Swiss-Prot record:
Domain of life: Bacteria
Gene expressing this chain: rpmE
GO molecular function: rRNA binding; structural constituent of ribosome
UniProt protein name: Large ribosomal subunit protein bL31
Keywords: Ribonucleoprotein, Ribosomal protein, RNA-binding, rRNA-binding
Function: Binds the 23S rRNA.
Species whose genome carries this gene: Synechococcus sp. (strain CC9902)
């Protein structure tokens, strides 16, 4: 015989709350879900995403680990 009352209570209209405002409803095991970020205010979904300049990071990595450009190595070899 299966055990009774082992499953959590299901709330079909659980409120998702972001910054004190109900942003959507969904099914969950808690009546209220508090979130910091959701698709309505996430930069990726709102189109306000910033493009990061990774060239500086690559240059910093190359400098840190001594992997300079090949141009500098050729110049040193010809001297």
């Amino acid at each position: 015989m299966p055990k009774s009352d082992i499953h959590p209570t299901w709330y079909p209209d659980a409120k998702v709350i972001c910054n004190g405002e109900v942003v959507m409803t969904t099914g969950a095991t808690q009546p209220e879900i508090h979130v910091d970020v959701w698709s309505g205010n996430h930069p990726f979904f709102t189109g306000t995403q910033k493009i990061l300049d990774t060239e500086g990071r690559v240059d910093r990595f190359m400098k840190k680990y001594g992997m300079g450009s090949t141009k500098g190595k050729d110049d040193d070899a010809s001297s």
